[in-house]
Design a protein with these regions (language model features):
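Short helix-adjacent coil turns
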Residues: 21, 25-29
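Hydrophobic/aromatic beta-strand elements that line small-molecule binding cavities or substrate pockets
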Residues: 21, 77-82, 95-97, 112-118, ...
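A solvent-exposed, acidic/Ser-Thr-rich amphipathic alpha-helical stretch
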Residues: 8-12, 16-17, 30-85, 94
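Basic/polar N-terminal segments that are highly enriched at the extreme N-terminus
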Residues: 1-12, 146-148
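Short beta-strand edge/turn micro-motifs at domain boundaries
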Residues: 110-140
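Short, cysteine-centered beta-strand-loop-beta hairpins and adjacent loop/turn segments enriched
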Residues: 98-107
Length: 148
């Protein structure tokens, strides 16, 4: 799907947006996190519900997630891979969070993330978010302790 010419520019623009979402997550700023999310963005997250739709739902989900932490937390994006054309792009990565929840539980978790983008009115916007963790087929439980 890569095209000649603006591919490098598109990839660098997407990379900057992903880095900005990581910074916004570390700052626990839901509005900054969703600044480049399309109004009708659809999300598949690692927690319930099965899906959510709309940037307002993303803001609400982010605020819930941020409020579940005891202070700040570490948030990193690893192995970011971007594929982009002039009007659509997607990226995937392994993301890592480390911190303490408000209930005192220590969290050191990795998950898989995919973001899909469309260029809307000359601006890259996130149109789909997918986060997942593998699960153990024998127990049916999420594999939250797995590391790359």
């Amino acid at each position: 799907m890569k095209t000649q010419g603006s591919t490098g520019t598109a990839e660098s623009e997407i990379r900057a947006l992903v880095e900005n979402t990581a910074k916004a997550s570390r700052a626990q700023d839901a509005i900054a996190l969703t600044a480049n999310y399309a109004p009708d963005v659809r999300g598949f997250d690692v927690v319930n519900p099965l899906q959510y739709t709309g940037s307002d739902a993303v803001v609400k989900r982010a605020e819930e997630w941020f409020s579940s932490w005891q202070g700040s937390f570490a948030y990193e994006i690893h192995d970011l891979s971007i594929t982009a054309s002039d009007s659509v792009a997607f990226c995937h990565s392994l993301n890592h969070v480390n911190g303490t929840k408000t209930n005192g539980q220590k969290v050191d978790m990795w998950w898989r993330a995919t973001l899909c983008f469309s260029k809307l009115n000359s601006k890259w916007m996130v149109t789909h978010i997918h986060s997942s963790v593998p699960f153990d087929m024998e127990t049916g439980k999420a594999s939250l302790d797995i590391k790359p």
